[in-house]
Amino acid sequence: MHLVENFALTAGVKISKPHIEPLFYPPPADKYITLHAGSGMESKNYSHYKDVISIIKPILDERGISILQIGETHDPHVDGTISLLGKTKLRETFFILSKSMLHLSNDSFSSHVAGFYNVPLVTLFGPTFPNTCHPFWRGEHKFLSPDYSKFKPSYSPNEEEKRIDKIFPNEIAYELIKMLFGDGIINQTESVHLGESYSQVVTDIVPNFTPEKNIN
């Protein structure tokens, strides 16, 4: 049961579609998708958006589509996006979302607002079940989550090893491009493992000489 249905059942009221009043804000691009990398819970925040953007940006650039990042001032800026972090009021953010071609985000308020406007959604889940917390009003969508067969969602605001980070960046990129343009634009690849050192840069230095035996 979805949380909205649960609340309605508990309160004994009917579910009706809310009214959201946006406020005009001039978008810095004519055609764009939106990214919201933050949320109210650290465990919901996906750590590998940079890799997703590196895959999809060349494809979007060819078609004149920008990536606008919305969120708070303290949210980390994702390379390859136009930052609107801390630059829009809440209702102005609603306007930006309402005109977006697609919205990519964690399980956060922005996905629910974008879904209200029937904006196509690619939404990531980690510490919560998608079927209970997904945007209640939505159009075309793809909800991605880790494998819950062994370990169920924690519903904790902090996780020592974030479950959401088990979602492969190439899977997100594939679903996003497929939703925008259909099949055939990007190849679907099968990933095997995404470890805790995935985001670390490791440099191996291999000398091109044999050191002397008495070297200290």
What annotation goes with each model-predicted range?
Residues 1-216:
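Catalytic machinery of carbohydrate-active enzymes
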